[in-house]
């Protein structure tokens, strides 16, 4: 055999041996290292992508004090889902609902109704919820003479101002005048209310209730409209609360939020004299802008109402305020009851009416039902399950 060929074969065999040896021994750490680095990278990526779960704490607390710093006991505080009462030192605590938008109190009879400002006398008894805020304190101002023994309550239905201009109005000299709805409401309705207040004996406490449909977005959404009607409603000496109506929301979250931004919670209460007023949103939308008529309540609202009334002394009179009549309507919820009166054919009473009456009948001071929506004034009386029930419908203003 050629000597050079032998040397070449030996070199090849040595190379193969070295390679085999390297694969068997030296390459194992290299493979492990690659695998370990890949695993570490995957673990790092997983940790990076998986955000830690932050548990939100919905526990809140606060106090209600008078201007002297004294705690106010026995005041109902709510988040719109549950109600609690302040203790003997005016303190309260609760676990608010994750969907709550306001923390607010039921204005006691011995205290002034707080307002947005000295020139905007719409009621401001609430604070907007913030996820960063855990303490909600309120300061109340005592009425100089204590709880009022008499007062006037001006109730109006459906201001329903729009963004559009109303039809032409005729001036005293027969010239046509074009006015916006807000201007018309301000120069006519509010002017009349101010004149009525002026005619009362000096010092008479005066309060107001709007029964909802403060606005209607006829002609498109207008972000300024709710604020404009609030400023008009708050421009007199009366301290005014408002119910929310169907046109204030029209089944759209944006519209409802704009009303809440200006007037606060939609389900609330307040006391004047020996009367406990409860205002509640009974506009139940089920298909776009369609709503049930008679009015209805959601189950969570029923729970809230039961809690509110359970914390209210039973010697009070209760006035339940809402927009759509509970005693009649012709676009009913499936569980609504047909009215039996011959002249009421095709009309129904709310599926909640029986429950509401059972809750209201607990109060020795009696009860009344206030609504709007109809645009005309009437006292609607029906015989319901053997009982005469009257509902006061307030005319559009």
Language model features by range: what are they?
Residues 70, 93-102:
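Short Pro-Gly-centered beta-turn/loop motif in secreted/extracellular proteins
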Residues 108-116, 122-132, 219-312, 339-368, ...:
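Extended active-site neighborhood of metal-dependent phosphoesterases/phosphodiesterases
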Residues 150-166, 172, 274-286, 319-321, ...:
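Active-site-proximal beta-strand elements of phosphoester/diester hydrolases
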């Amino acid at each position: 055999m050629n000597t050079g060929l032998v040397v070449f074969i030996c070199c090849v065999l040595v190379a193969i041996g070295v390679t085999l040896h390297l694969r068997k021994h030296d390459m194992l750490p290299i493979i492990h290292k690659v695998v370990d680095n890949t695993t570490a990278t995957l673990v790092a990526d997983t940790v990076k992508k998986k955000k830690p779960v932050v548990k939100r704490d919905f526990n809140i607390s606060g106090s209600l004090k008078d201007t002297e710093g004294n705690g106010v006991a026995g005041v109902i505080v709510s988040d719109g889902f549950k109600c609690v009462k302040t203790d003997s030192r005016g303190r309260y605590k609760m676990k608010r609902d994750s969907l709550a938008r306001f923390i607010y109190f039921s204005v006691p009879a011995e205290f002034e109704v707080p307002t947005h400002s000295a020139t905007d006398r719409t009621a401001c008894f609430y604070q907007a919820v913030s996820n960063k805020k855990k303490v909600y304190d309120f300061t109340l101002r005592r009425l100089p003479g204590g709880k009022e023994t008499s007062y006037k309550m001006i109730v109006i239905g459906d201001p329903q101002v729009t963004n559009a201009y109303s039809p032409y109005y005729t001036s005293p000299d027969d010239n046509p005048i074009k006015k916006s709805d807000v201007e018309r409401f301000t120069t006519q309705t509010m002017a009349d209310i101010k004149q009525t207040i002026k005619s009362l004996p000096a010092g008479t406490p005066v309060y107001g209730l709007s029964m909802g449909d403060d606005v209607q977005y006829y002609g498109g959404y207008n972000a300024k409209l709710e604020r404009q009607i609030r400023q008009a409603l708050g421009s007199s000496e009366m301290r005014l609360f408002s119910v929310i109506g169907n046109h204030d929301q029209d089944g759209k979250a944006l519209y409802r939020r704009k009303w809440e931004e200006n007037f606060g919670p939609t389900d609330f209460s307040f006391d004047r004299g020996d009367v406990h007023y409860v205002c509640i949103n009974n506009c139940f939308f089920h298909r776009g802008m369609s709503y049930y008529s008679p009015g209805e309540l959601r189950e969570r609202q029923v729970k809230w109402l039961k809690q509110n009334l359970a914390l209210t002394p039973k010697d009070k009179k209760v006035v339940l305020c809402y927009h759509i009549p509970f005693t009649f309507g012709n676009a009913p919820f499936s569980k609504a009851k047909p009215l039996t009166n011959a002249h009421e054919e095709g009309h129904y009473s709310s599926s909640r009416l029986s429950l509401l009456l059972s809750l209201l009948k607990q109060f020795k001071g009696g009860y009344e039902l206030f609504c709007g929506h109809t645009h005309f004034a009437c006292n609607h009386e029906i015989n319901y399950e053997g009982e005469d029930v009257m509902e006061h419908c307030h005319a559009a203003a």
